[in-house]
From Swiss-Prot:
Residues 1-25 form the signal peptide. Keywords: Cell membrane, Cleavage on pair of basic residues, Glycoprotein, Membrane, Signal, Transmembrane, Transmembrane helix. The chain crosses the membrane at residues 156-180. It is found in: Cell membrane. It is a single-pass type I membrane protein. Residues 26-84 form a propeptide. Belongs to the uroplakin-2 family. The gene is Upk2. One of its GO terms (cellular component) is apical plasma membrane. InterPro entries: Uroplakin-2. Interacts with uroplakin-1a (UPK1A). Residues 85-155 are lumenal. It comes from Mus musculus (Mouse). Pfam families: Uroplakin_II. The lineage of its organism: Eukaryota, Metazoa, Chordata, Craniata, Vertebrata. This is Uroplakin-2.
Amino acid sequence: MASTLPVQTLPLILILLAVLAPGTADFNISSLSGLLSPALTESLLIALPPCHLTGGNATLMVRRANDSKVVKSDFVVPPCRGRRELVSVVDSGSGYTVTRLSAYQVTNLTPGTKYYISYRVQKGTSTESSPETPMSTLPRKNMESIGLGMARTGGMVVITVLLSVAMFLLVVGLIVALHWDARK
């Protein structure tokens, strides 16, 4: 005798699929951990959308705080090469580390300003979006306020002279040592 359980559960499964996958889903822009600073003075580094949206048409929306104007930028979500992290270690050894940066850079921003960033990605018939994430650019420092110390001044001249004298003494010592060795 065949069970009627699969036939009875099919409508329930279809209803759950319709309710749980309405066509618009949310994803979060990653927390940007592992990066020294995602913010620069006139640009921001933003994590790419998740891997399941590869090939989708992404719209990055940037809104300045206390402003209603939204600047949009469209691009195709690039394919994933391994896990999608903002910064991933590609190779490490012998005292060096090679990393790959998987981010979208928003440029031409105002220094020291707060922005709200969000994505909307359309892939096929479904559209997914991220909530607005606040990010701020770094303030621009006045050039005169940056302490240079002895950069490009007497310190460099002194080091260059000391190294030149030491090199001269090494060459003279090598010539004298070779000359004495040839006498014996």
